[in-house]
Regions:
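Short solvent-exposed beta->alpha transition segments
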Residues: 28-29, 33, 44-94
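Loop/turn elements at helix/coil->beta-strand transitions in domains of secreted/extracellular proteins
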Residues: 41-43, 124
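Short, low-complexity N-terminal intrinsically disordered segments enriched in polar/charged residues
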Residues: 16-40
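Sec-dependent bacterial lipoprotein signal peptides
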Residues: 1-18
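Exposed beta-sheet edge and beta->alpha loop/turn motif
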Residues: 86-129
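Residue-level detector of secondary-structure boundary/capping sites
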Residues: 7, 22-25, 110
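Solvent-exposed, well-ordered amphipathic alpha-helical segments
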Residues: 2-3, 33-37, 96-99, 117
Length: 129
């Protein structure tokens, strides 16, 4: 939860320092931060980055955390892990408070994979959808 507040603070600072904040860029940075949590093994923060994370039962939240850990273990077996995440592009619809962020995973076996991360903005914070 503290990390979500940190992200909200970053968004607020960006909003105060510039009139025309690019919400697509904010969504992209938030998506990258959530995936950085995943790479760092902070699975709870990754799960908490999903929209409406606070309205799910604790048992389901624990299952999501376990799934994130299993996913990272699978990537280690198949690709020698995810070594880095890069933002490639973002397409934002500010009227609908939504964005699609395109990220590239750089794997330990020198392969790359581009993924699309749907994001949604709620009360000034961008969440994974």
């Amino acid at each position: 939860m503290r990390k979500l507040l940190y992200i909200a603070l970053l968004i607020a600072v960006a909003a105060c320092t510039s009139k025309g904040v690019d919400q697509g860029e904010v969504a992209a940075r938030a998506a990258k931060q959530y995936y950085d949590y995943l790479l760092q093994g902070d699975y709870a923060s990754f799960v908490d980055g999903h929209f409406r994370h606070d309205s799910i039962p604790d048992t389901y939240r624990e299952q999501l955390i376990a799934n994130a850990k299993m996913y990272m273990n699978q990537q280690t077996v198949e690709h020698r892990g995810i070594k880095d995440v890069h933002i490639v592009q973002v397409k934002a619809d500010t009227e609908k408070h939504a964005a699609n962020v395109f990220l590239v995973f750089a794997y330990g076996d020198s392969t790359n994979e581009e993924i699309v991360v749907p994001m949604v903005e709620n009360k000034g914070v961008w969440y994974l959808r």
